């Protein structure tokens, strides 16, 4: 609220804003006891984008399962969430989204499953390996996702994500191996991963879906428009650093005539904008009638 007031756009922003919030018991230092709880409440302004339908976890038309994958590249087991749409069969050869942060994928799947059931988007498969830990001991997730911090760790994760994951997914679930029906997806540091991987392996991915990127274009993520994937960008005006970086990507792609789409929302660094924009990106990529 204070950020909205400081920009002098209070009424306009409030009418267009969407954000999640929650209530948690605080200790004497003002910190949530036991950590931050669920962000299970929603504010949606009267002029904000319409809320998309969502299915409950136990009411999915498709299926969401967890698999244990032994990765030679990572030298460890890594859990992978796999969403299969209703009616899937191994010979379906469906479009596939390779996503980061599989340990947090459920809210996205609820929206995608509903959108598929309502025929708002075509059936897709989602392959989402869990992220490395991000806790008081350090941010291992960022070391795997982003170039320029730990080259060996980043390279090992690239071999896992790009090579091992796609081979396993094609063999186990019959997902498409065609570039135009492969997408890579991530938010925040996951968006940086999507942009870096999409650039480095442009022959594999026809679409790069990157929301609220924290790393602007530059030396760490070089981008050449020649043969680049279509980039779907989204950021909220109330997440200043991430909005600035994502807007820089939009400007960079526009300047270099690299195909892209940038959606700007009145929102913070908030899950709600990401789960609502992903079905729209899928419709834009593979649907006949893009969602508004």
Where are these regions (language model features)?
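Cap/lid segment of the alpha/beta-hydrolase catalytic domain
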Residues: 109-164, 168
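C-terminal catalytic histidine-bearing segment of alpha/beta-hydrolase fold enzymes
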Residues: 230-234, 239-292
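Single conserved hydrophobic/aromatic residue that forms the stacking wall/gate
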Residues: 2-9, 13
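Primarily recognizes the serine-hydrolase "nucleophile elbow" in alpha/beta-hydrolase
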Residues: 110, 171, 178-228
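The feature marks proteins involved in alpha-glucan
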Residues: 11-72
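Conserved acidic catalytic loop of the alpha/beta-hydrolase fold
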Residues: 82, 160-179
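Short beta-strand element of the alpha/beta-hydrolase
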Residues: 81-84, 91-102
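Short beta-strand segments enriched for Tyr within beta-sheet-rich domains
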Residues: 17-25, 82, 94, 161, ...
């Amino acid at each position: 609220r204070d950020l909205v007031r400081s920009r002098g756009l209070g009424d306009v922003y409030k009418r267009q804003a969407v954000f999640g919030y929650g209530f948690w018991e605080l200790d004497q230092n003002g910190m949530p006891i036991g950590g931050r709880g669920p962000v299970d409440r929603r504010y949606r302004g009267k002029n904000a984008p319409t809320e998309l339908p969502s299915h409950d976890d136990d009411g999915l038309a498709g299926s969401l399962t967890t698999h244990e994958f032994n990765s030679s590249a990572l030298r460890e087991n890594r859990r992978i969430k796999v969403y299969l749409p209703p009616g899937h069969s191994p010979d379906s050869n469906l479009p596939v989204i390779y996503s980061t942060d599989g340990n947090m994928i459920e809210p996205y799947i609820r929206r995608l499953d509903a959108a598929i059931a309502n025929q708002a988007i075509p059936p897709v498969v989602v392959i989402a390996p869990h992220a490395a830990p991000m806790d008081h001991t350090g941010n291992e997730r960022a070391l795997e996702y982003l170039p320029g911090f730990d080259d060996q760790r980043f390279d090992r994760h690239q071999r896992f994500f790009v090579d091992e994951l796609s081979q396993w997914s094609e063999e186990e679930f019959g997902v498409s191996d065609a570039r135009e029906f492969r997408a890579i997806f991530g938010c925040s540091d996951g968006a940086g991963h999507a942009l870096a991987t999409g650039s480095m392996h442009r022959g594999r991915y026809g679409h790069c879906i990157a929301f609220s990127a924290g790393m602007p274009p530059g030396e760490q993520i070089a981008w050449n428009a020649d043969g680049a994937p279509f980039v779907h960008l989204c950021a909220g005006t109330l997440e200043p650093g991430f909005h600035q970086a994502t807007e820089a990507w939009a400007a960079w792609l526009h300047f270099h005539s690299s195909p892209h789409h940038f959606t700007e929302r009145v929102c913070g660094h908030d899950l709600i904008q990401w789960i609502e924009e992903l079905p729209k990106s899928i419709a834009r990529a593979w649907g006949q009638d893009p969602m508004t």
